[in-house]
Each structure stands twice: as C-alpha cells, then as structure tokens.
Amino acid sequence: MAERENGWNRSRPLSRAFAGAMNRILGAAEARDNAGANLPDGSAVVDCGVYVGGKRQPGNYTPDAALRLAQEREDSFVWLGLHEPGEAEMSAIARTYGLHELAVEDAVKAEQRPKLEQFGPVHFLVLRTARYVPHRELTETSQVVETGQMMVFIGERFVITVRHGDASELGPVRQNLETERGVLLEQGPWAVAYAVTDRVVDLYLEVADQIEADLDIIEEGVFSRDSGSPIQAIYQMKRELVEFRRAVVPLQRPLAAIASKQSGLVPNEIRRYFRDVQDHLTRTVEQVSSYDDLLNSILQARLAQVTVDQNNDMRKFAAWAGIATVWTAAAGIEGMNFRHMPELEWIYGYPGFWALLLLITVLLYRAFRRNGWL
C-alpha cells in the first residue's frame, strides 16, 4: 500500500507539469487567435515587426499586439507592411493605429498624386512607384513603364507601408535595414520612410536608364533606311514618358518639405539622407525632361525625312513627265495633216525622226539623273 502511494505521489508532479504545458500551449494559441480576430480573412499583411533600439524583436506579431509591445518601450516602433489591403482590413488597422479616414480612403483606392499630408500626429506620404517592362520591340500597344502606388503612414511609434502594384517590393529594403543598416533604424519610423522613398527613387533612375536605351534604338531606326516607320513607336514612347513624368515630377514638393530645415518633420540625421534622395529625384526629373525634348527632335527629324521623301517622289514624277512630253509632242506633230512634209519624201526621214527622239530622251534622262531627280 505504501509503495502504491509513493508511486502515485511521484506521478502527480509529472501530471501537473504536463497539464501546465498544455495550458500554456492552448493559451498561446487562443491569444494568437484573439489578437488576429480584428482582421478579416485573407489578410494583406506582408510583414509586421517590432524594433527596439534599431533591432528587430524575434517572433511573429499581429498589428495590435505589435503596437502594444512598442508602446511599452521608449525606443521602439512597429513596421507594418501591407499589400493591396481591402477597405474592411484597412479600417480595422486604422482603428488600432488611429489613422484618419481620409488617409485610409486614399490608401485603399490608390489613385493619388504624390503628396505629403499631416493628420494630427500621423504623417501620410504618397509615392508613385515605377517599373520598366521589358519588350522585344516598341509598338503602339507596348507597355514600357508600369506604375503603382506606395503609401507610408508615419507615427510616433509606428510606420505603415501600403503597396499597390508589383513595383517596388519592400522585402529587400527591410532586409537591408535589418542586416546592414541597423544603426539607421535607431532613428525611428522616419528611417523606414527614408528607406522606402530611396528605393522608389532608385527604381526611377533604373527606369530612366532603360528608357534612354529605347530612345537610342528609336533614334537609330529613324536614320536607318532599312527600318520601317518609327512614328508609332515615337508616339507610344511619348505616352509612356508622360505616365512616368506623372510619377516623378509631383514628388519634388513632398521631398522638398521633408528635407527642409524649417519643417522640422524629421530628425536631423535622417534629413541628410532625404536630401540625398532629393538630389537623385532632381536628376531623374532632368533626365525625363531631356528625353521629352529628344523625342520631339526625333519626331521633327522623321517628319522632315517624310517631307524630303515626298519631294523626291514629286521630282521623279516631274522628270518622267518631262521625258514623256517629248514623245507626246512628237506624236502630235507627226499626226497633223500638213500638205507638204519634206521629211516624208526623204529616205532617212523616218529613222532620223526616231534617232532624234531617242537622242533627246537620253539627254534629258542624263540631265535629270545628274541633278538627282532620277
């Protein structure tokens, strides 16, 4: 009996330990389910990380759990990445993070010009992304530049990036900040806003370089007699350039506001980085303007070629008409009913007449050929 009691007493701690472990597992699962209960199915959350002192904390977090954790420490913030969220999901996140309804509407519709707005303690930055679409040849249906949108909400303890379209994936940006530029993350949410903006503008430069290569091909085709008419390609490139300009040019004002010392929006250390991005954007804007001027010059050159070709055709018509006039005049003269035509009585009259016509024809042909009319 004593042995059975001792065995029972030894097994009771094991049972309590097993039960405690199961309760912790079930409790953690229930906590995860409850934390994500405020988000609809098919979540657009790409990544949600908590950063303390510039270092990402291990573990997976829901948006509301991440914000609660970030509010516990002074040097921490949340980076929440979204891809094409729906209205219901964006509204749930807005309630958690205190986002303004107008900014939420813009983030869902994704049809905004680049801008910077402030809603209380939250700044709302809109960027237009761009990506070069490879193609074999440029036609009137070719897509050269694919654009999308990037929205960035910058708060005191969070930064939310909302991406629409396939351009400017932020995975490499996040990895670069976490592994190679962790010191920059110590500056807080504006460091992420800088990294995202820098990524978008760097892609602008890549697109501009690819467009320049296309322009070289178009220019070569204009002055190559073997190619077809490049006018359709020129107009298509102008349309694509207009689309690219809509993404690039309006971003100048928001970046100028962020980089300005008077604004006081960002820390001084981050402002220096934004000024570098502003310089890159200025370079891109200058490239786009020069490309537009180059396209206009190429178009004018092509139209001048068409005019010259038409004039050459008209000169050819005029030259052959002049040669034909000689034969027409001779036929008219010989067809008249004169009573006395001395050449008819001459034995060499008929062959002499043909020899004279051929001589005049050859002389006219050589004259037109020498002057470039034929």
Each model region followed by its residue ranges:
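Hydrophobic alpha-helical transmembrane segments and their immediately adjacent juxtamembrane loops
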Residues: 2-16, 279-374
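Long amphipathic alpha-helical coiled-coil segments
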Residues: 259-271, 295-306
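Peripheral, non-transmembrane regulatory/ligand-interaction domains of membrane transport proteins
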Residues: 1-267, 273-276, 280-290, 373-374
